[in-house]
Amino acid sequence: MKNRHGLMGLVVALLTALSMIVAAPQAQAANRDWLRPDSTGTCEWDRVGYWVQRCTVWSPAMGRHITVQIQPAQRGGNAGLYMLDGLRATERTNAWVQDVNAARTFVNHNITLVMPVGGQSSFYTDWNAPATYNFNSPVTYKWDTFLSKELPAYLQRHFGVSPTNNSILGLSMGGTAAINLAALHPQQFRQVLSYSGYLTTTIPGAQTALRLALLDGGLYNLNAMWGSIFDPRRYENDPFLNMGNLRGRDVYVSAGSGTPSARDDRYLPQHKAAGIALEMVANFTTRLWSAKATATGVKHTAVFTPVGLHNWEQFGYQLNRSKPQVLNVMNAW
């Protein structure tokens, strides 16, 4: 009898272990293999693959549906990683999907990627007035409201992302915006990363540079964003001036030197020239930001590479370099 009971116990133990082995990949797939509801019906599979869904989220603030590319966490974790685009963001796809395939980078990890589509020249902020000079077809930008209020509610309901357990990163314009959003909404973002962002926006010459960049990026009106040079909103949205709110958060800032490397050989001469100039400015402003942060006790990681232009070679490198820091802080391995 004892031997029989012992044999049955062994069989039960083996079956239990086998069920756990089978259940693990099923649980992982279960969070990813079904399309969530969205504001126009149901999300769609994105052609990039890697479980990315294209979802539309209604924005009352902007009066339209916003497309967001979302890769659910592998095992249903509640951490989110918001990934912001650059100045020339398109309405087709978030560049983090298209240019470096961030979905492939994080496919084996327990964090939900949140990649909003659109927002060209927006700095992901709430604009005071219609964004362009085309008054016959006004563009309403209320990206801060969307990213901090409207989108989190959707993500929590349909993807299980906590409104208070998020990281946010961005490149160039998106790096500036990521620092600002993390400072303005410290309860939402535990971590922020800026890759080649412009982290001082009100020093002499910065406003002129921004004005020219917005005009070049689609005839956007700088005064419609944060008002005139005398408007307090210009200073409230300067990463150099609002860094105090980042105390207690994990902060990562980076920039290249503007010196080309062999990785940049594939770029056309005019694109390399622009990449040199833009990255040198990003490097200068990020160093200023880092120096002040150090002096005022804002803990952060600063990475300045000896080579690197303002392009996807640099942005992709920084994403992969900082990936372990994201996963460690967000407990999302």
Predicted regions and their residues:
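N-terminal secretory signal peptides that target proteins for export/translocation
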Residues: 1-4
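Non-catalytic cap/lid and distal C-terminal segments of serine-dependent acyl enzymes
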Residues: 6-10, 26-333
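Gram-negative bacterial Sec-dependent N-terminal signal peptides
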Residues: 10, 14-17
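C-terminal segment of classical bacterial N-terminal signal peptides
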Residues: 17-26
